[in-house]
Amino acid sequence: MTKINNINNYKIFGVFDGHGYNGEDISKSVSNYFIDYYENTKFYDETPIHIFNDYKKDDYNLIRKCIINCNENLHKTLNCEKSGTTINTIHIINTKIINTNLGDSRTIFIDGNNKVIQLIKDHTPDSIKEKERIYEMGGEVSRVEWVDYGPFRIWFKGENYPGLAMSRSLGDFDAEKIGVINIPEISDIDIVEKNIKICICASDGLWEFLSNDRVCELVLGYYNSDDVKGATRKLMEVARKTWEVNNNMGIDDITIIVLFFK
């Protein structure tokens, strides 16, 4: 979590899930760039916090610009032909939350009626619009050839490469040729208006075998006892067990952020 320029009313949380040979370096570089970009943007140094009432236009544009600049920086600094990272961030501005997604990480919100709200769908190759773009660019979408389970992946036509399980990311410069794009989706919600009490942001390792509703069930008791660390540990524990049961190839990296609003 980062508090921008020590402004109490503005905080950023994020999950950056790297993949490929240089995935760890790329995810670290992108997360650091993201924070440095916001810390060094004069918009925040010079703008009183009350002006964020008109946050949407300025912040949406700032997020998009940050991601574009970050991708250009990756071109200059790291080998990203076969590696990249997803991005899922939560910007909290007073009572507003802006959620940005690029890839297959996910954020959900739980309201006072225990209803789950997901503002942005995962960017996966099997979703209709994403698949159409990939095929138009000459790519193919299928599961790994020798198994009948697991995520759909993106391939060069007739090849067994690159096998990405997400259709949007930063980096992955080879996969850009077959429709993998770095354009994020951005949406927002008001904590007070929608009576939001829990926010969970996590990499696909949490969501692969656990539904939104199951994740909600697992954390509700911890909300009542105000035990956010316990909720995070429980999700991690259950997620790892589901991987052990459902996948004999190992356990995916799992990153989880849990926020309680009281």
PLM features per residue range, with description:
Residues 1-262:
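PP2C/PPM-type serine/threonine phosphatase catalytic domain
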